[in-house]
Amino acid sequence: MSEIIQDLSLEDVLGDRFGRYSKYIIQERALPDVRDGLKPVQRRILYAMYSSGNTHDKNFRKSAKTVGDVIGQYHPHGDSSVYEAMVRLSQDWKLRHVLIEMHGNNGSIDNDPPAAMRYTEAKLSLLAEELLRDINKETVSFIPNYDDTTLEPMVLPSRFPNLLVNGSTGISAGYATDIPPHNLAEVIQATLKYIDNPDITVNQLMKYIKGPDFPTGGIIQGIDGIKKAYESGKGRIIVRSKVEEETLRNGRKQLIITEIPYEVNKSSLVKRIDELRADKKVDGIVEVRDETDRTGLRIAIELKKDVNSESIKNYLYKNSDLQISYNFNMVAISDGRPKLMGIRQIIDSYLNHQIEVVANRTKFELDNAEKRMHIVEGLIKALSILDKVIELIRSSKNKRDAKENLIEVYEFTEEQAEAIVMLQLYRLTNTDIVALEGEHKELEALIKQLRHILDNHDALLNVIKEELNEIKKKFKSERLSLIEAEIEEIKIDKEVMVPSEEVILSMTRHGYIKRTSIRSFNASGVEDIGLKDGDSLLKHQEVNTQDTVLVFTNKGRYLFIPVHKLADIRWKELGQHVSQIVPIEEDEVVINVFNEKDFNTDAFYVFATQNGMIKKSTVPLFKTTRFNKPLIATKVKENDDLISVMRFEKDQLITVITNKGMSLTYNTSELSDTGLRAAGVKSINLKAEDFVVVTEGVSENDTILMATQRGSLKRISFKILQVAKRAQRGITLLKELKKNPHRIVAAHVVTGEHSQYTLYSKSNEEHGLINDIHKSEQYTNGSFIVDTDDFGEVIDMYIS
């Protein structure tokens, strides 16, 4: 044998071979044929079982025998892949109508593996035989198998639209398919309507075929997605579990799941829900139990008392496979190539296949009827001259001589002569003559009917309709999946996601924030808070994990931080810097922090800047869903800083204190509500080179404590403050000195909650009791507390 050596580039060889491989796996492995809805391995399994007599009316046979037949005759691949395909055809949670009945463990909805093929037994289901019916009547083309030892069908007759009824899923080179299963009665009804009116629209078809009908049931949402898929082959729907509510004896409620989305692994779903419970991602679930038994699927989710079951349901829909999105991608092999097809194209392709199948069957039956008619006519003629025929046969040498004599003497045909010589003597009675004449009449009618079907297209379509109606009547079942027109928007209450727990929120002046358990706080005490050198506590208060923290900075921005997102850190340990939660600028400083339980309130914030601007904005404006970056609270002009943020439930007095000792007190009712991006209005009429040190709310029972740079503290009562109008100069609180005058560096409104003060220089701090500071008159500079020569110039004061 001579060798042919070709000199080819690697790129050409790889491209050519991969092209061949891709074509093979597209056409011969992963995608179904639009006509019978089967992939090649599925078709070969069903045909092997049918041809070996492993039908529904016979006993079950070992699966291993079928797998062996398929591998040996039609599908030269691994036994495991053939067995897996065979098992899938028997799983009633994968197929809307199973094509194989199987005894033994054929897997489960938990994705458990089936028993080995040597243990399970199988046979064709009754419906599967409708796919194969009339296959022996030359209805479809056969091709040689892989080793040319036998023939296999290119496609099955498929007497019902299996592609739509059982759907298909698969991935090949460059193509994937996801066709959902449908209700058999609905699909057949839609096909019948298409036969009556080939111009029927998708909208009209959807009166009969409502949408997918999954074997696992569930609730389908989104008619628009179904319509889009039926029109174009692509679309998206939502499939959610069927969930009911039960009340237990102890008063608790539990959610009972009886149907889950198609192709969702039940055990994985149960595990996921239990993980959400264990990780405290959802609050209100006591226990998750899989109570599935032979009576049906059942998952029980026991809830705590007084929880909102609807919110928990919504959370699970969003965060587990209790609800999934299903994407139609209706790709099938049509005319030898993959095509994305809408429902009209699929039905049209199926109908054309049925026209061909019924026409071929009719031709086959007509041919047989005509052949039998010819024989019957010969037998009737022979019986009419029976004595002569018998005498001729007796005088013949042998069977061959008898046949030749019959043909020559009485002009019988070869086929008629063969039938006559094979005729048994007991058939030569008057009864058989009558029977033959009756058969002749029946054959005449049959041939006329068959010719009418072949000559008349409408008659052929009527045959298809009658046979489809028979299958519909025999195999119809109620719809399992409920269809809802709209996709429901899922709203989740925060209470469901976050366990309710009282904690201590703390913020330091240097911007370190944390939440601490009440237990850790009580075990330590306020003084033992973890701090960096030079840092001090700005604020601490009891909050709930379901609250939201608003952190305000000198740049007029705020950080929106849900309390549950704060790190849970022990009281004695250092907190987390806010910049690690939300990025802020290097020179940005935290000036105050508040918690909000509900933004639906009439409360408001007041913002005051160093250069004397002020603004009021209502609390609801600060609600947001963006946590990842700072947001605008107020517009701060260049060379200005936000220095005070206050929160009030209703209008009240505020006092403004400046560096040069001026004070203006007025009511917040003078401020109009403004948006977050507004800069506000003038708060106080500042002197040259003066600036605001603090703006705080004040009431009649309060006192004002002020610290000067020279180490003096001055405390005054509310009555010294004179209530005036906004934007005035205000009153003087210090005695002006010509040399080294006192300047206020810090001031606070002292309420009944405050008892201590702390003075700060760059390197020192001094603590004392507020009540030790006697109240002063208006025009004094207070009392010296520290010697600045030793302590350093005072730069700040903190009260607690």
Swiss-Prot record:
It comes from the Bacteria. It is a peripheral membrane protein. One of its GO terms (biological process) is chromosome segregation. One of its GO terms (cellular component) is extrinsic component of plasma membrane. Pfam families: DNA_gyraseA_C (PF03989), DNA_topoisoIV (PF00521). Its main location: membrane. The active site is at 119 (o-(5'-phospho-dna)-tyrosine intermediate). It catalyses: ATP-dependent breakage, passage and rejoining of double-stranded DNA. Keywords: Cell membrane, DNA-binding, Isomerase, Membrane, Topoisomerase. Its EC number is 5.6.2.2. The keyword Disulfide bond does not apply. The record marks 118 as: Transition state stabilizer. GO terms for molecular function: ATP binding; DNA binding; DNA negative supercoiling activity. InterPro entries: GyrA/parC_rep, Gyrase/topoIV_suA_C, Topo_IIA-like_dom_sf, Topo_IIA_A/C_ab, Topo_IIA_A_a_sf, Topo_IIA_dom_A, TopoIV_A_Gpos, Type_II_DNA_Topoisomerases. Residues 31-495 form the Topo IIA-type catalytic domain. It is found in: Cell membrane. The record marks 39, 75, 77, 88, 94 as: Interaction with DNA. Heterotetramer composed of ParC and ParE. Belongs to the type II topoisomerase GyrA/ParC subunit family. ParC type 2 subfamily. Topoisomerase IV is essential for chromosome segregation. It relaxes supercoiled DNA. Performs the decatenation events required during the replication of a circular DNA molecule. This is DNA topoisomerase 4 subunit A. It comes from Staphylococcus aureus (strain MSSA476). The lineage of its organism: Bacteria, Bacillati, Bacillota, Bacilli, Bacillales.
